[in-house]
Amino acid sequence: HRVGSVGKPLPNLQVKINQEDGYRQGEGEILVKGPSVMVGYYKNPEATAQAIDAQGWFHTGDIGMLDEGFLRITDRKKEIFKTSGGKYIAPLAIENKLRESPYVAQVIVVGENQKFPSAIILPEFETVRKWYQSQGKTIGSNEDLINREETKDLIKQIVDESNANFGQWEKIKQFRLVADEWSIASGELTPKLSIKRKVIVAKYKDLIDGIYSGNNHR
């Protein structure tokens, strides 16, 4: 097994990466074929035709790559978006990299049909407070915390470090910090704790619009 991969495909399973859609080099939708793959949707020929092509390949909807025989899944096809310049952005890969920081609780990457991707970031407030306390400072509310320049500088450093792992067109050019926690109860997260993209984009519509309307403060 290789770290970051889901292992090698089963012996009787054929795996192919469809690189026709123009993702990153070597990356594309994962197609599979073999006796263990479903033959179609019950009494739903339209759905079957969408999922299984004329050559019998099942289109998984996952984006990934083969790395020396190991299969690596990088995103879901339905979550990938294009910038106005026609470049594909795989938000999950960027979000996961940013969430590696102890100072980031949640993040969503936005920028569909825009010139560049941006991020809405929910800080891990407990960790950020400890960072302030280590400097002998105490902070009031979460709202106070996200408006402090030191917090923005801290998160910018994390964004810059994350950006080093991605292509020029994938780099987060701007971000905004938000103070309200995302949860299942308040509707931003699924029961599996995945983010509900449409809900979050709608919730922060004004904030996102501000990023792309020339309102360029961090």
Task: List PLM regions with ranges.
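Adenylate-forming
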Residues: 37, 70-99, 128-148, 168-170, ...
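Conserved loop-to-beta-strand segment in the C-terminal subdomain of adenylate-forming
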Residues: 26, 112-137, 164-179
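Gly/Ser/Thr-rich phosphate-binding loop
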Residues: 1, 14, 105
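Active-site phosphate/pyrophosphate- and oxyanion-stabilizing loops and adjacent acidic/basic residues
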Residues: 4, 46, 95-96
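Conserved C-terminal "lid"/linker of ANL adenylate-forming enzymes
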Residues: 106-108, 131, 156-218
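Conserved ATP-binding/catalytic segment of the ANL
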Residues: 9, 18, 23-25, 29-83, ...
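C-terminal boundary motif of the adenylate-forming
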Residues: 18, 63, 101-127
